[in-house]
Regions:
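Helical hairpin unit composed of two closely spaced alpha helices linked by a short loop
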Residues: 34-64, 68-75, 81-90
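Short hydrophobic beta-strand motif reused across regulatory alpha/beta modules
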Residues: 48-52, 98, 112-120
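Bateman (tandem CBS) regulatory domains
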Residues: 2-14, 64-76
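Short gly/pro-enriched beta-turn/loop segments at secondary-structure junctions
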Residues: 2, 9-12, 25, 32-35, ...
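Terminal peptide-recognition signature
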Residues: 7, 30, 45, 71, ...
């Protein structure tokens, strides 16, 4: 059985920005990393939010005049690194989302990685 840890992207692959990042910078990271989302972290590196394409659409007017903390969805859904990939895939399907940040349940809230629905599908998780 495959766990999230085996499929997740970690380190520099993670699309993360501090909460005071201007939206132009967040869009750049979102494009460079290729996940279609960007995670938002506080000064301690803890995941506090996520910016998705839906957030971008909701804030189209004057988008670039904002910082990420004004646009983000707070308290994003996450998955534990030891969770089964099949469970993560089921969550993504049920919630109609394509990515989950991987955060250890007993940690300090800092993300270990990000899992994309395509990672599960490529690995044959169904």
């Amino acid at each position: 059985l495959t766990t999230v840890r085996h499929l997740m992207h970690a380190g520099d692959e993670m699309p993360l920005v501090p909460s005071d990042t201007p939206m132009a910078g967040a869009l750049l990271v979102m494009s460079q990393k290729g996940f279609g989302v960007v995670g938002v972290t506080d000064a301690g590196g803890r995941l506090t939010g996520i910016v998705t394409d839906g957030d971008l659409r909701r804030h189209m007017d004057g988008l670039l005049s904002h910082v990420v903390s004004e646009v983000m969805t707070h308290n994003p859904l996450t998955v534990a690194p030891d969770a089964l990939a099949q469970s993560a895939l089921a969550t993504m399907n049920a919630r109609k989302i394509t990515c989950l940040f991987v955060v250890p349940p007993d940690g300090d809230g800092r993300p270990d990685g990000i899992l994309q629905i395509h990672d599960c599908l490529r690995a044959g998780v169904a």
